[in-house]
Amino acid sequence: MLTAIITDQHFGCRKNSDLFHDYFLQFYEIFFKNIEDNNIKTVIDLGDTFDNRKSIDFSALQWAKDNYYDRLRDLGCTVYTVVGNHTAYYKNTNSVNAVDLLLREYDNVKVISEPTEITIGGLPILFIPWINQENEYDTLMAMKKTSAKVAMGHLEIAGFYAYKGHVMEEGHDKNLFKKFDYVFSGHYHTRSDNSQIYYLGNPYEMYWNDLNDERGFHLFNTENLLLEPINNPYRMFYQIEYYDGIEVDYDEYKNKIVKVIVKQKNNVSEFDDFINDLYKADVAEVKIVENFNTEEPPMFEELESEHTISIVNKYIQESTTDLEKSKINKIFEEVYKEACEMI
């Protein structure tokens, strides 16, 4: 049986931004076309369906119902949704969670807040929601006892990319999952795998560190265990390297967030016209980076190719401190995301 797997949708992200929700809609047209074309009746959601674990914007909830849950219900799809860290209200238990409280009107939505084995299309699957202080023992026991060869969940496993360029050092040891033939997980937003454990990545760009990193969802066949990525062709973030005389298709950047890296600007008037033309094309936001220090080109190349998180994390790794660097990295990432929500 062919199923669809999607994860880390983060409805209501960026302070329930209309700009981002309109961008998300472009992806969901592709998603639902695949659902209909392939007559898919089972959708598996691997967590973090909503963005804010502490509160929900009512308009974000209505948007999710109108554009996602109502459509799945009308298509006759059963949705298995795993509780992730963003949908669990408390950090030490999954008992209070957004998907259970907000989606009770949908009989087709099955919320998984504790480790549960479910057979889909003849395939036994162990579903593992966010592991915390309360459920860790029960989760480990469920993993030990199950005969399922496939596990799916919202997991934090060490040794995989949290985002492009940064491997997570904290998390559960991957050897805990060695009994499974395949493990499919949400949580990390970039795709990575070791041919047994697969982080599937989220459907769309949300932050600058998502730039030029493939996004989308997956089709999974429960009979032959084939996993097929369906990429999202739409982008939110663009980076332009500016030179005198550059020619661009301004329409490409409508309702997008653009970073202009100035590598040459001998004609100031021409540059001003370029920026004005970007705004005339209804660009959502323009960031300009200028650096003409030719004495240190390696540093400029490094900075222009990296995003804020990776630059700071590299600084942390190279610093001299007795503190646990992986924990400092994690704290900074949380602060960075909170800051992004405020702009």
Language model regions located:
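Accessory, non-catalytic peripheral segments of nucleic-acid enzymes
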Residues: 222-343
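Core catalytic region of metal-dependent phosphoesterases/phosphodiesterases
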Residues: 2, 9, 13-117, 176-180
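Conserved beta-sheet core of the metallophosphoesterase superfamily
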Residues: 163-229
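Short, conserved loop/helix-junction motifs that constitute active-site signature segments
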Residues: 72-75, 142-146, 174-179, 251-253
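Divalent metal-coordination and catalytic microenvironments
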Residues: 8, 43, 48, 64, ...
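Active-site-proximal beta-strand elements of phosphoester/diester hydrolases
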Residues: 2-13, 122-131, 150-154, 198-201
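Active-site environment of divalent metal-dependent phosphoester hydrolases
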Residues: 10-14, 51-54, 81-92, 118-119, ...
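Conserved catalytic scaffold of divalent metal-dependent phosphoesterases
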Residues: 85-175
